[in-house]
Amino acid sequence: MAGSELRERRRSVENARARGEAPVAEIGESWTRCRRTVDPAATAAPVDVEPEEVRQRWEASPIRRSAVGLEEQLTLAAEAGDLVAAVTDQDGRILWSAGGRTMRRVAESVGFVPGGRWHETSDGNNALGLALRRGR
């Protein structure tokens, strides 16, 4: 999703809130927390580690060791469906991803790439950050 699309989506959400259409409590609480730590003008998640460090983290990851053989299947499924599949560590940093050409470009434009940090405190309200917060 491009920056202009993100801004439009934000306006839509803000307009809904102005009309009294409250989000699910869990989402509203996340927005409140994010206001303290996230730059509202940011259009991409921070990618602040070197590729070699990401590779080392992925190689050492317990998920990687248990997913041997699944990477190829996930890659094929992601490419065939033109979607993005990703695995993060316990801190919300993407360690591995694969995707179809179109969605991979979109993912790259918002920092949804290996090394990208998708924790609620660094990138705002998002599914990965919320899952981490809830322990799911």
Q: Each predicted region: which residue ranges?
A:
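Intrinsically disordered, low-complexity terminal regulatory regions
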Residues: 1-121, 126-130, 134-136
